[in-house]
């Protein structure tokens, strides 16, 4: 909703600045989106009249004029505007004037002819009006008057973002009421002479859907001059409300729309056949609208029709056939109340959204129609002339909405606000809002206003009291509450620690949708059944995720397409696996997923550029596992997964139970997800990760540690993890450290075999180990490896 400050102040003029007024409106819940000047800064521009206008002797497109600005001397001005002509009232920038952009007007010669000023267009003065040529002012504009003063250009356009419940403020009358209430000032509505019918011309109105249209008014106005000029004051008020001037009849209906928030429509009376009918479409009728588009009218859509055809979509859009044109002489003014539910959604279904439907969907005042049709008729008579007939009304009192009756309790008011507002203030606020208030014992019986469709329950009234009383006048009081420490098992690893570790290792947390593209998910989990949403946001978001892979891979592709070469993401969330044995038929599991791609490190002169591989992400996962005291319970095992590379995939196990997978993305998935380069992922069950054991404090041994390196040759199929696990088991008493520092295949090692170089660190907490003891431990390790894996020491 746009409106000019000056127009608002015609209704109510509080003694506050523009900034304070905007702040008041915002704090009242009508958020001010912007305040813009109606014109750029300029000075020295006055109203003049072109007394003489002739062609320039040396330029076909220039005109030499003599202009009067009310003084005894005429001013010579050379002008290039095509609409410059004798007798025209114009905007004259005098010598010394400063126009927008710090453009100063000086005496000059154009093609040899003197020019002592400039005839201005709207754009040259920073006024947003589409117009060819110079400004054309009304013939009664007073010569010599400052243009800023005449057009009231020291004004601002205020744009308010209204919520759907405040339809009463979709007109100047509602905004003025709000400002008046906030400043304890009375609202001065415009005054006009009531219209007395001067002709008996009228139409018969037949409302067949009274629940959808409880009130319909029609009035004939004969012999109107549709070619009359819309007054400049009306054009300016419409422009500052974001509406361009079209013709006087349309301008008048738009003007009362902005003034009172009540949509109207005008029909060409000569195009009507028989009675006016308000009925539903039959599902087969078509209508060409005022914008030239043709629509088929659904059977549940309300229309205005005559005996021959539909004339308009009720409350939405007028029809082209019956619209006012240059040849119109007699018009029928329509002013109606349409029930919000009768209009709601109809315009959007047809791809339309109009100022009328916007208001009717939210609700207009059902008691406003008589006043508005009289206001519009008076404006038509004053601007276009003509003779007005009587107002014809079709009304269903039973279907007209009634003001809500709401009981407001003092106890409920105090409880919700947490602050005592005196009884006198409560009554004053509600009455200033136009409500009727009757005091009871510890309560008030309130009858709301007809224009407040959003008043239905007690909390609505409490909000109004708080809003007008002022949120800033309600002190901040800390709630009284008993604090209790939350339960936390020491055997549980907190998710916060896991998140912090991943962030410290260069990851960023992603939050993806729980519903994913079923086509992409089928590539990741072929043949697995997923939950399908009955009403998805879109077809690409219609399946619940079976793992974190789909969302994370989509996020990687999104980032890579935006020049992000190095991507490291993690996400925690639920996966949804159909399970007939689970509650509601779905098993929800909390999961942790990570993905990396691109270089290991950000580009740096002292670092070699190297692409991430399987072991980079495995190292990150082992760092997470290291947060638990139960790291020895975790292991990895070569496996296969439909989404992972068959040669670079492993299961993640805890106590020999599979809790997740890690590996490189299968090459067949790179193109569908838009992946560029090797991508490594893992996913595991959070519950299996976060449960740990209490740490046991141990003294640090003061005796020296001893390192022994062994190189064992095993089959290529033997997992290094299994080898390390066996060594740890055999040497658990004295072996304090195991490190695989080399894997070798090639010369000196038989085909099908590999060499594992392992560092063994031995230490005792009570004494220094002797060489014999160390040798025995190493020998027991080698012997166990030989027995289990047919391993041999490499020479």
Swiss-Prot record:
Molecular-function GO terms, alphabetical: ATP binding; magnesium ion binding; phenylalanine-tRNA ligase activity; tRNA binding
Domain B5: 401-476
SUPFAM superfamilies per the UniProt record, alphabetical: Anticodon-binding domain of PheRS, Class II aaRS and biotin synthetases, Nucleic acid-binding proteins, PheT/TilS domain, Putative DNA-binding domain
N-terminal signal peptide: none
Keyword Signal: no
One of the GO BP terms on file: phenylalanyl-tRNA aminoacylation
Class in the EC hierarchy, top level: ligase
Membrane spanning stretches: none
Family, similarity comment: Belongs to the phenylalanyl-tRNA synthetase beta subunit family. Type 1 subfamily.
Protein name: Phenylalanine--tRNA ligase beta subunit
Name of the gene this protein is made from: pheT
């Amino acid at each position: 909703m746009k409106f000019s400050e000056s127009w608002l102040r015609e209704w109510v003029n509080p003694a506050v600045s523009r900034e304070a007024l905007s702040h008041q409106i915002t704090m009242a819940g009508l958020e001010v989106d912007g305040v813009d000047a109606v014109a750029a800064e300029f000075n020295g521009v006055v109203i003049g009249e072109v007394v003489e206008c002739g062609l320039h002797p040396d330029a076909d497109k220039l005109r030499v004029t003599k202009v009067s600005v009310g003084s005894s001397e005429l001013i010579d001005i050379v002008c290039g505007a095509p609409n410059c002509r004798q007798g025209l009232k114009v905007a004259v920038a005098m010598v010394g004037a400063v126009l927008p952009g710090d453009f100063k007007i000086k005496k000059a010669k154009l093609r040899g002819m003197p020019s002592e000023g400039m005839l201005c267009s709207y754009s040259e003065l920073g006024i947003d009006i589409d117009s060819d040529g110079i400004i054309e002012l009304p013939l009664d504009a007073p010569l010599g008057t400052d243009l800023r003063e005449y057009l009231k250009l020291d004004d601002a356009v205020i744009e308010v973002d209204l919520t759907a419940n405040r339809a009463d403020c979709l007109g100047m009358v509602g905004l003025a009421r709000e400002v008046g209430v906030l400043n304890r000032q009375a609202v001065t509505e415009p005054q006009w002479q009531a219209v007395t019918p001067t002709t008996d011309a009228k139409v018969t109105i037949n409302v067949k859907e009274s629940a959808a249209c409880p009130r319909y008014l029609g009035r004939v106005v004969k012999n109107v001059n549709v070619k009359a000029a819309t007054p400049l004051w009306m054009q300016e008020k419409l422009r500052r409300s974001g509406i361009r001037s079209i013709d006087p009849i349309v301008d008048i209906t738009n003007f009362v729309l902005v003034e009172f928030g009540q949509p109207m429509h005008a029909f060409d009376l000569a195009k009507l056949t028989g009675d006016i009918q308000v009925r539903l479409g039959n599902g087969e009728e078509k209508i060409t609208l005022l914008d030239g588009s043709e629509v088929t009218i659904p059977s549940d859509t309300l229309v205005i029709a005559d005996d021959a055809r539909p004339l308009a979509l009720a409350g939405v859009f007028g029809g082209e056939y019956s619209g006012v044109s240059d040849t119109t002489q007699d018009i029928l003014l329509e002013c109606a109340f349409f029930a919000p539910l009768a209009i709601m959604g109809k315009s959007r279904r047809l791809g339309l959204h109009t100022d009328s439907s916007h208001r009717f969907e939210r609700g207009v005042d059902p008691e406003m129609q008589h006043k508005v049709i009289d206001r519009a008729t008076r404006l038509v008579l004053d601007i276009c002339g003509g003779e007005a007939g009587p107002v014809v009304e079709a009304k269903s009192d039973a279907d007209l909405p009634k003001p809500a009756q709401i009981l407001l309790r003092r106890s409920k008011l105090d409880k919700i606000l947490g602050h005592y507002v005196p009884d006198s203030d409560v009554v004053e606020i509600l009455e200033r809002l136009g409500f009727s208030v009757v005091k009871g014992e510890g309560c008030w019986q309130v009858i709301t206003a007809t224009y407040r469709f959003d008043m239905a329950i007690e909390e609505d009234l409490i909000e109004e009291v708080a809003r007008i009383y002022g949120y800033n006048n309600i002190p901040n009081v800390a709630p009284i509450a008993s604090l209790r420490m939350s339960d936390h098992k020491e055997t549980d690893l907190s998710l916060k620690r896991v998140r912090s570790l991943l962030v410290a290792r260069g990851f960023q947390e992603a939050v993806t949708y729980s519903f994913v593209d079923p086509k992409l998910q089928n590539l990741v989990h072929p043949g697995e059944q997923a939950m399908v949403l009955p009403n998805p946001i879109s077809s690409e978001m219609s399946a619940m995720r079976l793992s974190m892979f789909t969302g994370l891979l989509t996020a990687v592709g999104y980032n890579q397409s935006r020049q992000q070469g190095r991507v490291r993401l993690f996400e925690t969330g639920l996966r949804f696996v159909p399970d007939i044995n689970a509650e509601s038929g779905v098993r929800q599991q909390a999961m942790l997923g990570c993905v990396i791609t691109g270089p290991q490190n950000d580009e740096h002169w002292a670092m070699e550029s190297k692409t991430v591989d399987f072991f980079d992400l495995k190292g990150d996962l082992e760092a997470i596992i290291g947060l638990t005291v139960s790291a020895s319970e975790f292991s990895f095992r070569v496996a296969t997964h439909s989404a992972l590379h068959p040669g670079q995939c492993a299961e993640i196990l805890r106590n020999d139970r599979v809790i997740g997978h890690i590996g490189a993305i299968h090459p067949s998935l790179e193109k569908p997800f838009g992946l560029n380069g090797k991508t490594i992922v893992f996913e595991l069950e959070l519950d299996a990760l976060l449960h740990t054991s209490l740490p046991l404090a141990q003294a640090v041994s003061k005796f020296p540690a001893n390192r022994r390196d062994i190189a064992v040759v095993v089959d290529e199929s033997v997992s290094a993890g299994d080898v390390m696990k066996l060594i740890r088991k055999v040497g658990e008493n004295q072996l304090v450290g195991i490190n695989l520092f080399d894997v070798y295949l090639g010369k000196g090692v038989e085909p099908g075999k590999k060499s594992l170089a392992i560092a063994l660190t031995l230490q005792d907490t009570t004494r220094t180990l002797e060489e014999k003891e160390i040798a025995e431990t190493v020998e027991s390790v080698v012997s166990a490896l030989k027995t289990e894996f047919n391993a041999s020491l490499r020479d």
